A protein has these predicted regions:
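A short glycine-rich, Lys/Arg-flanked "PGG" loop and its adjoining helix->strand segment in the class I
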Residues: 29-46
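SAM-dependent methyltransferase
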Residues: 51-132
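A short, glycine/Asx- and small/polar-enriched loop/turn
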Residues: 9, 97-99, 156-161
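C-terminal lobe and adjacent flexible extensions of AdoMet/dcAdoMet transferase-like proteins
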Residues: 118-168
Length: 168
């Protein structure tokens, strides 16, 4: 996977979008991805990093255990298959901003057969401060810091923490 494999080099742009850092288990893994992105970019190349904005303590809705929630990755496919995704928080370390979840994906095929896959996952919701530090430590100059997808400046109340950074 992205943590273990070598990344090719010489790119003009690397995109780490759509909360992709949330899919990694720890701050150390997330910083590793920033470092690998730096190695993949040529000098002067750009890095786009996009995450939901959560500063300070782990948000209260990330601390509720035992509730199975339907995720946005659900819906109908072109062939008539139905996909439903669920997550249930099973463990929380609020001080270190870590959560473990039980994830389940169910696919009901047009003929009625259901295929299901369940797996465990750990997440570390990153803060803007962490990302800023990793960027600076890995030779990036932050060109812009946006707070949403329309390009509004980042504030403490922004829904997103989006960085546009240039490799020095």
């Amino acid at each position: 996977d992205a943590l273990e494999r070598e990344w090719q080099r010489g790119y003009d742009l690397v995109i780490l979008g759509g909360n992709c850092l949330y899919e990694l288990a720890t701050a150390e893994e997330q910083e590793t991805i920033i470092r690998k992105a730096a190695g993949a970019l040529k000098r002067g190349g750009f890095l786009f990093v996009d995450n939901a904005h959560m500063e300070g303590e782990l948000a209260p809705d990330w601390q509720v255990t035992g509730q199975r929630r339907k995720l946005g990755l659900s819906g109908a496919c072109a062939d008539g298959s139905q996909v439903e995704s669920f997550a249930e928080i099973t463990w929380v370390d609020a001080a270190n901003r870590l959560v473990r979840l039980r994830r389940r994906v169910e696919i009901t095929l047009p003929g009625g057969e259901t295929i299901a896959q369940e797996y465990e996952q750990q997440k570390h919701p990153v803060s803007a401060g962490e990302v800023r530090g990793w960027l600076e430590q890995n030779g990036f100059e932050i060109q812009q810091h946006y707070g949403d997808y329309t390009g509004s400046p980042y504030t403490d109340n922004s829904p997103r923490a989006i960085f546009w950074a240039r490799k020095g």
